[in-house]
């Protein structure tokens, strides 16, 4: 076999050195990124790969599932909003599963609240909360690992707005303002996971969907997702 000229050997060694440095840097990012904003993700769609390790390119997986830091007082009067939240959260979730848990239970054990609804859902509630996805210190209603997407859900709000998305009473116009504040906070932590990380807001009612868009929820983020009552995936 012919000997490789010295300049070619030097070039090969230089390329190998650069490749090793790049691999080490990539490994360093993989080991140190844990719920930290500021590092850009690389493209990876977990629905198209066979090796779970390849899904590590989605930085949103560095969040965690658990009860939200702010208590959720779930009662009979507002339960549909949380049923819808869990419906949206589980539409494309996996292996994560979002459900109801007992307030204060740190084991994240999902419970069937139908069994306790009659005795526990009278009054102001407060005995149950929901599992959500925490990333960058911000809570999201759900996480779709296969799509590298975090989601927010807005349930029965349509009766507050007319068909144009305007509040039926003046104070009702404050609701979309609060939505935009929440969206802005969520977007700030999702942006650092570009280009893979995505945020979607799902609305059960068309009037609320219109109100959200009027207030500033971007068209590419807002989704009208009707709910078949009683369906929690």
Report residues per predicted region:
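Alpha-helix initiation/capping motif
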Residues: 70-71, 78, 144, 165-168
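Conserved catalytic cores of phosphodiester-cleaving nucleases, focusing on short active-site segments
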Residues: 140-144, 148-163, 186
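Short secondary-structure boundary/capping elements
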Residues: 134, 178-181
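Active-site or metal-binding loop neighborhoods of secreted/extracellular toxin and effector enzymes
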Residues: 1-22, 180, 184-233
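Acidic-basic catalytic patches of nuclease active cores, encompassing PD-(D/E)XK
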Residues: 3-138
């Amino acid at each position: 076999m012919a000997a490789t000229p010295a300049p070619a050997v030097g070039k090969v060694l230089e390329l190998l050195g650069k490749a090793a440095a790049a691999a080490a840097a990539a490994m360093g990012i993989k080991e140190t990124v844990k719920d930290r904003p500021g590092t850009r993700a690389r493209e990876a769609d977990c629905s198209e790969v066979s090796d779970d390790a390849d899904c590590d390119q989605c930085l949103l997986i560095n969040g965690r599932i658990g009860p939200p830091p702010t208590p959720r007082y779930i009662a009979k009067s507002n339960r549909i909003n949380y049923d819808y939240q869990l419906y949206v959260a589980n539409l494309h979730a996996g292996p994560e599963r979002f459900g109801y848990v007992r307030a204060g239970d740190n084991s994240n054990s999902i419970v069937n609240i139908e069994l306790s609804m009659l005795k526990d859902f009278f009054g102001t509630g407060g005995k149950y909360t929901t599992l959500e996805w925490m990333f960058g210190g911000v809570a999201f209603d759900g996480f779709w690992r296969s799509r590298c997407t975090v989601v927010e859900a807005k349930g029965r709000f349509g009766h507050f707005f007319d068909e144009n998305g305007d509040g039926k009473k003046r104070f009702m116009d404050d609701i979309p303002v609060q939505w935009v504040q929440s969206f802005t906070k969520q977007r700030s932590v999702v942006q650092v996971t570009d280009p893979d990380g995505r945020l979607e807001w799902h609305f059960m009612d068309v009037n609320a969907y219109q109100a959200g868009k009027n207030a500033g929820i971007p068209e590419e983020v807002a989704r009208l997702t009707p709910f078949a009552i009683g369906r929690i995936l």
